[in-house]
């Protein structure tokens, strides 16, 4: 090997040699797989080759100095763990694989130890574009710590780690973060849901974000997920630079699953392209394949010489030169035939069938496929498009031919096949890892070199369990059994394959373009299942990163799940294959598997999507080829001989075309397919499922005109063989289905990336429920027409979850759409899960609770549900949850012919989607036709109506009050809220008849403003009358009370007219007659005599009123009105009025106008009634209804009156009453202290000994009027003034002394009169009931006397 130096641009000087391997050091891929080769790849770092110098201690291989410069993509491989030689090739290498490296001219890569601090790492470069560390793009190092990064964006993000500024603050908990994405991930912790669930057996932990889940896996399950740089946003195949950059494909990421002990702080995964080239070179060195085809090869042979070279060129092992490229790698001129430009991102699919398990007769347990996005599209990095030069790659260099000796026939390591990508899909490369038996056969490789002739495999007895078909999302054309490889190139390629010649040139249309008659994937599947020990290499070394919108953390988590569970489910296969954009014009998705898979283990119960090899169905159902290449107006080609596999693992031949097959195998004949794909790809963000599951209403039939039982459309509830989604709909739940069986919504490769695994959490765990805050925020979405898929935007709920929430389409019927070839509105009901999920028919918002949807509907005030149910909320899990919703019925019946429509049931009622406390009143339909939980009508209804243009709904007329409720009272006619939501009333809405709208519930029990509603008895209702045909109390989740009568009640707004509502106005008369007109009212009081002018008379009248309000009067203490009436009858004579009150009583004849007049306080309360009132008052406070029920002899009005009279006469506080006894005990001591505080002269002190008495806080004037004889007189003003001057403040009324003036002023309020009435009752509320003696004494006096 020549000495070379690529310059000093790189920040990390390194040494690299490619010495030859000895025969004993050959890499054995089977051992590699068995020994977990993949986890050790994380120990390698990357650095530019600009500073590489040869290592003099290593032998120089026979290789030119420009090899690495041209073919290693200017990247070198370092060991980040122990700085040894390349671990990938040395640690797990054996002699045979080392010899193969030596034959290929690939020596041992010697890496220099990385600088301290991990200068060669680019661990922070996880987001943004990764640039090549080439002399044109030198590595960028951190000026603070010296770490090396391949892009400026990675370096800028790394500098944040050195900064202490945290400008992104959480508004909820005020926690600050340096980066916005960290804050976004932190916000997930404030949700009430934990969608990231550990699916290890026996572990039920769940977390809010993927970081916590990853940490959980590392700590508890010993699994470690590496972070990586996400795939860069690459240009589509139609961009001009896609062809120019064929020699240097963009780097792509590689994820690995390693034990915690294998991690190193600054390590980064090895470059995937480099590793793939190296291993592909090794494999194809060992793979027996024919030599280069002669220049004059026939069309059929040229078609089959797609991969005559043993090594892969670029990222594809079968990458022939384009029509404009020099065929140096093949040393032959390949036929040039124009093909369509690339339209879809490339996709790498990897398979690792193991024949050993099949040979042993034991089925290998299936392994969960990587995340649904794991096999996402990739762009130009994966294949070399048409017109690009052949990228020279190890070990096939420009101008070199591979000698036959470099292809040994005997080998014991697994061979890997890197099939080229389709030119229109930018390299759908497929890795196939297969371990043949010890004695491989060469006759297949010697026979006609078909598209997969370079990847021979051996046929083994099929395993009884789930084969590789359960796990591999591509047909068997990739796995050619050597013994069955057709020798006839024409038969191998197929006569009806017009694109066969292109398989040689432009990546040979690699993705699953298999020909009729070729052995399908079943032969390879019969060779055995995927071994558990092959998973590390399968997942870590060759798994490509996804299209730019894919979250790389999700891939890591799913790889971790894959390793821990080792279960491949059909649902996951379908989900993954749905992410594989197939080449336009290629045969579309595979048919689903027939049969319910009775032999599968429980985890595989929901797995339905399997892979059936065949010319017409080379792709898995649900794949983009099947989802996107759906042009109903274009005839499909159905190829006979479709190889299918039954549930027992055997082969099953059925001439069944794909339901959504491509129009033709020749893309040139269907140019609108690529335009359709481009249109779909141009949509921003996430596409609605209607973009991905076009339910066209057309069902492809066989050539003979029959429709197979399994050929049902997506969106059709069919038996288990019709798709994973239909099985999921039927409730067959499984771990893989519930955790990883979702479909990834494809987006624009150029669309902005969203970081974090939370973008994919809905796909990871479709059972996750929305938190109440999410439902509340999402409920504010405005109503509107169906969102345009090309302008689809993320809802609030999806933004919270990172932008990848399922935006379900409206339940539409697509017969008319199929006629127009419109693919934008599909019905994805076959994709549902057995969990109740509700979708707003107006805005496609998804809700996990019925209450969330019902509350959300109240915000669509201008677009309420139609009474005919044209727009129904979609219900997930039709077998499980049908609460007040109609189950969305897929198009037609399962047995109906294609395109048949079911007429809409005119009596099918709409779902009740109303907020709480809103009445529902139907108009024209009977109660039996309502939609309160009638699933039958809902299931029979198709989704046709919502495809029509939505019309604004009119507000329905308000409902009416019904008959008396359970309590015996008429239900109120109050209405709430402003709109009376009633989807059962002709779809018409009216405003509330009352202004302003009442706030109380319209159906509440009890009286209201509009109490007794008069019911009309007319049999025919006028336009303003409604039939109140209500149901019983509806679902408790709604909280709706409904009326149960069928009376016809008019609730039209009107003005109440009549003597009951308006006063009668007398006729107008002359003013002169007013003086002679006698007043109809009786005069009961007027000032007599000189009462208006004489002050003495006024004083006498005032004294009479005071006496009448005192306890002297038997009638009560506040009968001022009675005193005035008596004074009026006495014509102003105060003495006569007083005698009337005291002696005779105010007795009036029956003819008197006031004979039946009831005076306040005139009721007589017996002692028993008083005692009961006190007990009731202490027990119920001011609830006079309960007091009345306890007394039973007094009405509520009498109890209220007694309370207020009592309150005026006695100042009591029932809350402080229990402390009276303590107060009584303290008052004697207060008296003593008061006497000590009262200042007096020394000579007065001996003669003054006041008698101690209880100083209650009642209105006691007796303390002044009737003090003991030996008590001194009141303090003189001088004495009081001197006392105040000394800081002592005595009361002038009761001689209490206070230390503060404020205390005395507050105390003086007790001595004030209430309403000019002298408080006479001076007895405080006793704690104990009154003694009978006291009651007897008080029974003779008035009701307020004690």
From Swiss-Prot:
Ranges of compositional bias, category Low complexity: 294-323, 440-458
Annotated zinc fingers (C2H2-type), start-end: 140-162, 168-190, 196-220, 838-860, 1289-1311
Basic residues composition-biased segments: 1248-1258
Superkingdom of origin: Eukaryota
Record-level Gene Ontology MF annotations: transcription corepressor activity; zinc ion binding
Consequence of changing residue 712 to L: In a breast cancer sample; somatic mutation
Bias (Basic and acidic residues): 934-948, 1234-1247
Domain ELM2: 1053-1145
PROSITE patterns (UniProt xref): ELM2, SANT, ZINC_FINGER_C2H2_1, ZINC_FINGER_C2H2_2
Transmembrane region(s): none
The keyword Glycosyltransferase is assigned to this record: no
Keywords, comma-separated and alphabetical: Activator, Developmental protein, Differentiation, Meiosis, Metal-binding, Nucleus, Repeat, Repressor, Spermatogenesis, Transcription, Transcription regulation, Zinc, Zinc-finger
SMART domains in the record: ELM2 (SM01189), SANT (SM00717), ZnF_C2H2 (SM00355)
Record-annotated SANT domain positions: 1160-1211
InterPro entries to which the protein is assigned, alphabetical: ELM2_dom (IPR000949), Homeodomain-like_sf (IPR009057), SANT/Myb (IPR001005), SANT_dom (IPR017884), Trans_reg/Corepressor (IPR051066), Znf_C2H2_sf (IPR036236), Znf_C2H2_type (IPR013087)
Segments of skewed composition (Polar residues): 21-32, 671-685, 1264-1273
Cellular component aspect of the GO annotation: histone deacetylase complex; nucleus; transcription regulator complex
Compartment(s) where it occurs, according to its Swiss-Prot or TrEMBL record: Nucleus
Single Gene Ontology BP annotation: regulation of transcription by RNA polymerase II
Function: Transcription regulator which is essential for male fertility and for the completion of meiotic prophase in spermatocytes. Regulates progression of the pachytene stage of meiotic prophase by activating the expression of genes involved in meiosis during spermatogenesis. Maintains the repression of pre-pachytene transcriptional programs, including meiotic double-strand breaks (DSB) formation genes in pachytene spermatocytes and suppresses aberrant DSB formation after mid-pachytene, thus ensuring meiosis progression.
Subunit structure: Interacts with DNTTIP1. Identified in a complex with KCDT19, HDAC1 and HSPA2. Component of a histone deacetylase complex containing DNTTIP1, ZNF541, HDAC1 and HDAC2. Identified in a complex with HDAC1, HDAC2, DNTTIP1 and KCTD19.
Name the record gives this protein: Zinc finger protein 541
Species this chain originates from: Homo sapiens
């Amino acid at each position: 090997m020549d000495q070379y130096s690529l310059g000093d641009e790189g920040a990390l000087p390194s040494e690299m040699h490619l010495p030859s391997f000895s025969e004993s050091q050959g890499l054995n891929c089977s051992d590699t797989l068995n020994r977990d080769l993949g986890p050790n790849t994380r120990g390698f770092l990357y650095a530019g080759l600009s500073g590489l110098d040869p290592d003099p201690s290593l032998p120089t291989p026979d290789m030119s100095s420009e090899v690495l410069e041209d073919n290693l993509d200017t990247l070198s491989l370092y060991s980040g763990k122990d700085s040894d030689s390349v671990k990938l090739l040395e640690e797990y290498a054996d002699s045979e694989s080392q010899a193969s490296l030596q034959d290929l001219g690939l020596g041992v890569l010697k890496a220099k130890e990385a600088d301290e601090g991990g200068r060669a790492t680019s661990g922070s470069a996880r987001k943004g574009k990764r640039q090549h560390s080439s002399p044109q793009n030198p590595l960028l190092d951190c000026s603070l710590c010296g770490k090396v990064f391949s892009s400026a964006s990675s370096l800028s993000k790394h500098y944040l780690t050195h900064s202490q500024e945290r400008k992104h603050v959480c508004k909820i908990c005020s926690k600050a973060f340096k980066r916005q994405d960290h804050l976004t991930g932190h916000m997930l912790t404030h949700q009430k849901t934990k969608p990231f669930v550990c699916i290890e057996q026996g572990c039920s932990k769940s977390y809010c974000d993927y970081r916590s889940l990853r940490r959980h896996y590392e700590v508890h399950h010993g699994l470690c997920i590496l972070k990586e740089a996400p795939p860069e946003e690459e240009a589509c195949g139609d961009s001009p630079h896609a062809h120019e950059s064929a020699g240097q494909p963009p780097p792509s990421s590689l994820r690995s699953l390693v034990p915690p002990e294998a991690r190193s702080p600054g390590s980064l995964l090895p470059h995937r392209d480099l590793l793939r080239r190296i291993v592909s070179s090794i494999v194809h060195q060992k793979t027996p394949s024919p030599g280069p085809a002669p220049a004059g090869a026939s069309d059929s042979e040229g078609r089959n010489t797609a991969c005559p070279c043993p090594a892969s060129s670029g990222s594809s092992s079968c990458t022939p030169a384009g029509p404009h490229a020099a065929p140096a790698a093949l040393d032959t001129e390949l036929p040039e035939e124009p093909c369509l430009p690339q339209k879809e991102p490339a996709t790498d699919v990897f398979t690792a069938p193991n024949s050993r398990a099949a040979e042993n007769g034991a089925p290998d347990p299936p392994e969960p496929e990587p995340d649904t996005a794991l096999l996402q599209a990739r762009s130009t990095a994966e294949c070399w498009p048409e017109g690009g030069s052949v990228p020279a790659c190890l070990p096939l260099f420009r101008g070199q031919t591979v000698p036959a000796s470099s292809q040994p026939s005997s080998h014991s390591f697994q061979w890997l096949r890197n099939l080229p990508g389709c030119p229109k899909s930018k390299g759908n490369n497929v890795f196939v890892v297969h371990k043949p038996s010890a004695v491989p056969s060469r006759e297949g490789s010697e026979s006609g070199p078909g598209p997969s002739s370079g990847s021979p495999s051996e046929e083994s007895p099929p395993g009884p369990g789930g084969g590789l078909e359960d796990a591999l999302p591509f047909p068997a054309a990739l796995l050619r059994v050597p013994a069955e490889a057709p020798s006839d190139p024409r038969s191998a390629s197929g006569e009806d394959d017009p694109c066969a010649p292109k398989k040689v040139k432009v990546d040979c249309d690699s993705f699953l373009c298999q020909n009729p008659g070729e052995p399908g994937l079943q032969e390879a599947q019969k060779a055995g299942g995927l071994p558990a020990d092959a998973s590390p290499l399968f997942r870590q070394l060759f798994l490509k990163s996804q299209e730019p919108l894919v979250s790389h953390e999700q891939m890591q988590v799913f790889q971790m799940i894959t390793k821990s569970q080792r279960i491949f489910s059909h649902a996951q296969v379908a989900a993954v294959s749905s992410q594989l954009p197939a080449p336009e014009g290629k045969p579309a998705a595979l048919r689903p598997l027939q049969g319910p898979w009775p032999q599968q283990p429980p985890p595989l119960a929901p797995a339905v999507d399997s892979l059936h090899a065949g010319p017409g169905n080379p792709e898995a159902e649900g794949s983009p080829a099947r989802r996107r290449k759906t042009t109903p107006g274009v005839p499909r080609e159905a190829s006979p001989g479709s190889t299918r596999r039954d549930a027992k693992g055997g082969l099953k031949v059925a001439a069944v075309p794909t339901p959504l097959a491509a129009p033709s195998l020749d893309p040139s004949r269907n140019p609108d397919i690529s335009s359709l794909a481009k249109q779909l790809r141009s949509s921003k963000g996430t596409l609605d499922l209607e973009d991905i599951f076009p339910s066209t209403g057309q069902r492809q039939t066989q050539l003979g005109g029959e429709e197979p039982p399994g050929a049902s459309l997506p969106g059709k509830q069919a038996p288990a063989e019709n798709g994973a989604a239909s099985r999921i709909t039927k409730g067959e739940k499984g771990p893989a289905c519930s955790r990883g069986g979702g479909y990834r919504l494809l987006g624009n490769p150029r669309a902005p990336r969203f970081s974090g695994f939370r973008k994919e959490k809905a796909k990871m765990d479709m059972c996750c429920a929305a938190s109440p805050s999410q439902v509340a925020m999402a409920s504010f979405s405005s109503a509107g027409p169906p969102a345009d898929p090309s302008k689809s935007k993320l809802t609030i709920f999806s933004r919270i979850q990172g932008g990848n929430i399922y935006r379900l389409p409206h339940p539409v019927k697509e017969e008319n759409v199929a006629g127009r070839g419109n693919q934008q509105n599909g019905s994805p009901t076959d994709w549902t899960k057995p969990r109740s999920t509700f979708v707003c028919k107006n805005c496609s918002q998804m809700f996990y609770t019925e209450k969330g949807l019902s509350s959300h509907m109240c915000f669509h005030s201008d677009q309420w549900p139609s009474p005919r149910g044209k727009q129904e909320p979609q219900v997930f899990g039709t077998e499980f949850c049908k609460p007040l919703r109609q189950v969305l019925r897929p198009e037609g019946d399962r047995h109906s012919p294609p395109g048949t429509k079911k007429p809409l049931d005119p009596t099918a009622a709409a779902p009740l989607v109303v907020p709480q406390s809103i009445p529902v009143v139907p108009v024209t339909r009977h109660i039996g036709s309502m939609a309160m939980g009638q699933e039958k009508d809902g299931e029979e209804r198709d989704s046709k109506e919502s495809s029509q243009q939505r019309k604004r709904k009119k507000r329905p007329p308000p409902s009416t009050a019904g008959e008396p409720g359970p309590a015996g009272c008429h239900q109120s006619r109050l209405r709430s809220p402003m709109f009376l939501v009633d989807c059962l009333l002709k779809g018409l809405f009216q405003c509330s008849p009352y202004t302003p709208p009442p706030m109380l519930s319209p159906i509440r029990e009890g009286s209201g403003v509009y109490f007794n509603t008069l019911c009309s008895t007319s049999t025919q209702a006028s336009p303003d009358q409604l039939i109140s045909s209500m149901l019983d109390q509806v679902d408790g989740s709604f909280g709706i009370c409904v009326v149960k009568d069928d009376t016809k009640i008019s609730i039209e707004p009107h003005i109440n007219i009549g003597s009951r509502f308006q006063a009668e106005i007398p006729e107008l008369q002359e003013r002169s007659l007013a003086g002679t007109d006698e007043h109809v009212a009786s005069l009961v009081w007027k000032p007599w005599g000189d009462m208006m002018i004489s002050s003495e008379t006024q004083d006498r009248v005032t004294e009479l009123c005071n006496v009448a309000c005192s306890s002297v009067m038997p009638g009560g203490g506040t009968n001022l009105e009675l005193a005035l009436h008596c004074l009026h009858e006495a014509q102003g004579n105060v003495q006569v009025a007083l005698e009337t009150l005291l002696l005779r009583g105010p007795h009036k004849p029956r003819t008197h106008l006031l004979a039946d007049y009831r005076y306040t306080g005139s009721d007589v309360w017996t002692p028993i009634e008083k005692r009961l009132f006190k007990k009731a008052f202490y027990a119920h406070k001011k609830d006079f209804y309960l007091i009345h029920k306890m007394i039973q002899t007094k009405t509520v009005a009498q109890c209220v009156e007694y309370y207020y009279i009592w309150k005026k006469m006695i100042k009591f506080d029932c809350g402080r009453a229990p402390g009276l006894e303590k107060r009584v005990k303290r008052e004697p001591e207060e008296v003593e202290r008061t006497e000590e505080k009262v200042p007096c002269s020394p000579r007065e002190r001996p003669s003054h000994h006041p008698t101690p008495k209880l100083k209650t806080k009642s209105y006691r004037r007796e303390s002044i009027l009737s003090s003991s004889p030996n008590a001194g007189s009141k303090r003189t003003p001088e004495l009081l003034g001197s006392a105040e001057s000394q800081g002592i403040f005595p009361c002038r009324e009761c001689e209490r002394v206070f230390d503060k003036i404020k205390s005395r002023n507050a105390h003086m309020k007790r001595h004030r009169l209430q309403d000019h009435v002298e408080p006479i009752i001076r007895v405080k509320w006793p704690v104990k009931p009154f003694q009978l003696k006291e009651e007897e004494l008080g029974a003779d006096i008035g009701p307020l006397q004690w």
